[in-house]
């Protein structure tokens, strides 16, 4: 079974990137649970025409879509038995920069899944949670691992560096460098790009969401 997780602490942040791996996993007949906190509203960056395919736009507009049904039935991380799941999937959107680093129940749950041989996957800004997840030795699971995520060049192209400075955020390049990871940039910032290192799977951006989900399944079955 799959635990596909996305927490949102601030109401202005929800990413339809969540919908893309949701659909990929659903097509595989995967059983999973969404975890969400608080009220969710749209992040304009995530629902712009350039960010979404036609099918994604249709899913966003159709409140009867299975994606929205899953969100309505989402649980808090504290109410989930993580031992029941074999994949932890953290989807991005800039909102995760606010809440993932302090989401201790998610950190512990992901560590539980990882300790059982499960897969930890994350895409776009979702990987911001990874340095917070510890292995059995107490070190971050990304130490010495090869990863990717939404990179600094992409933030610059979106003119978001002033926002990073305002909130004292570190770019994901910097964050993973400090965590002792080998961060790999896609050839172009918005290319479909995924890195798999053992049971750790990361994707660079919205275009990589479906590929990251597929890679997570492949890693689980390898």
Swiss-Prot record:
Catalytic activity: methylglyoxal + H2O = (R)-lactate + H(+)
Active-site annotation: 124, 125, 155
Signal peptide location: none
GO CC annotations on file: cytoplasm; cytosol
Location, primary (coarse class): cytoplasm
Record's subcellular location: Cytoplasm
GO MF term set: glyoxalase III activity
Presence of keyword Amino-acid biosynthesis: no
Keywords: Cytoplasm, Lyase, Stress response
The protein's Enzyme Commission number: 4.2.1.130
Domain of life (superkingdom): Eukaryota
One Pfam family cited in the UniProt record for this chain: DJ-1_PfpI
GO BP terms in the entry: cellular detoxification; methylglyoxal catabolic process to D-lactate via S-lactoyl-glutathione
InterPro entries (alphabetical): Class_I_gatase-like, DJ-1/PfpI, Prot/Nucl_acid_deglycase
Family from the record: Belongs to the peptidase C56 family. HSP31-like subfamily.
Primary role: Catalyzes the conversion of methylglyoxal (MG) to D-lactate in a single glutathione (GSH)-independent step. May play a role in detoxifying endogenously produced glyoxals. Involved in protection against reactive oxygen species (ROS).
Protein name in the entry: Probable glutathione-independent glyoxalase hsp3104
Organism of provenance: Schizosaccharomyces pombe (strain 972 / ATCC 24843) (Fission yeast)
Gene coding for it: hsp3104
